[in-house]
A protein has these predicted regions:
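Small-residue-enriched hydrophobic alpha-helices in membranes
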Residues: 1-186
Length: 186
């Protein structure tokens, strides 16, 4: 975990989005490198904010952090550790992103996958980024594969070799895609 990276990112987040009082305090604690579960609990108690309400806001903060770190299209080991740290601090459980912020994660993943698939080929580094995205959003292989299928289908329609796209289509899906693609060319 790199508190300096978190500090810089959360300074940017504070400038970018309008935060409630308690979220401003929590961001300040991150920026001042004094964040802990206890300090979060204290802020929530002092501001009379129920944790279940705050959890949704915490998820939004983490998503903003993820968007910030993905601006360079790379997820470093340190950045992944920072995401894990934030999940622990905010008591985020597996499935919370998908349940509470499905639209946000879909938009973030779609944006990254669109960029990854734009050249109709998935490099080893891009395949690892897909795995990293799956991991930081706590998605199953099938969930991530379903997101990837959308972009991979576009690449296949453009003539890409499916073997170079790091995606799994069922036999039926693949041949439907191939048939539809050939049908459009006639």
């Amino acid at each position: 975990m790199d508190k300096e990276n978190l500090r810089i990112s959360f300074q940017e987040i504070e400038k970018k989005i309008l935060l409630s009082d308690y979220l401003q305090e929590i961001c300040s604690a991150i920026i001042n490198k004094s964040i802990s579960k206890e300090s979060i609990d204290e802020i929530l108690k002092r501001k009379s904010v129920n944790y279940s309400i705050a959890k949704v806001d915490f998820l939004h903060l983490i998503i903003e952090y993820i968007k910030n770190i993905l601006e360079d299209d790379i997820l470093t080991v340190t950045e992944k550790e920072n995401v894990k740290f934030l999940k622990v601090m905010f008591r985020i459980q597996q499935g919370d992103f998908y349940y509470h912020n499905k639209a946000d994660i879909e938009a973030t993943i779609a944006s990254q996958l669109s960029r990854i698939y734009q050249d109709n080929y998935i490099s080893d580094e891009e395949a690892l980024l897909k795995v990293d995205l799956q991991e930081i959003f706590d998605l199953s292989f099938d969930q991530m594969n379903d997101y990837a299928k959308v972009e991979a289908a576009i690449s296949i329609q453009k003539g890409a070799d499916p073997k170079s796209l790091d995606v799994f289509f069922t036999h039926k899906e693949f041949f439907k895609l191939k048939y539809d693609n050939n049908d459009n060319k006639v």
